[in-house]
Structures are given as structure tokens and as C-alpha cells.
Amino acid sequence: MTTIPEMIHARFAIDTARGTGITASETIECVLSRRAVRRYKDEEVQEGLVDVLLACAQSAPTKSNLQQYSIIIVRDPIVKSKLQELCPKTDWLASSPVFLVFCADMRRNQRISEFRGYEHANNNLDTFLNATVDAAL
């Protein structure tokens, strides 16, 4: 069994006594062993799986639970190549089967307010910053 100090060492390459004697829960183990893999199988991601993963992402808490972002699903190889050109050090992007772009979306809550018959009074820098943070989460 891997200990928390061993997991911290593997993650950050530092020796520490933090977590000594504490049993790692599945959540702690999952978070500390997380890593990014940017090698992809040469196959499409099932549409239903993308929908489920997006539902999970949109279930994460955000500022006031407003979900002030929109998600653009990119599958087109030409569009992915153009995005790769705009983003340095993303050689992996064009080879990804699907690429998700999270965008701060102030217009989303404006439209919800209009739909429900309310005035959208928070059209200001604070709303922009909240939307940006929501997209980044």
C-alpha cells in the first residue's frame, strides 16, 4: 500500500512527513495520483460518453452555481490544427479525438434572466471575472 508521503513524493518530487499515519481515502489517492496523458488511441470517443463527462463537469460547483461558461466541442481536424497553431506547446492537440474549449459566457445568464422575465443587473466586471473563473475551474 502506498502512503500519503510516498504519493506526495511521486507527485511533487519532495520528501515530506505530511500525511504520515493518515490512511489515504480513495479520493486522496485519486487526486494525488492524477496525471495528464496526451497520447490518444486512434479511435473516436463515443458521443454518449462525451455527454456524460460534460454533465459531470457541469455538476462541479461554481460561483453561485451559475455555471457561467459554455463548452465548445471540437472534433474537426482542421479546426483542431488551427487551434494548435494559436496555442504554443500543444503538439498533442491536433491528435486528440475530441477537444473541449471552455469559454466564459456572460451572455448565458443574460439570456436566462430574459427568459424568466428578470432584469440582468450584474452586467459588469465582477460578472466577467466570475465567468472567467467558472470556465477555468
Positions of predicted regions on the chain:
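Acidic, surface-exposed loops and disordered segments
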Residues: 1-137
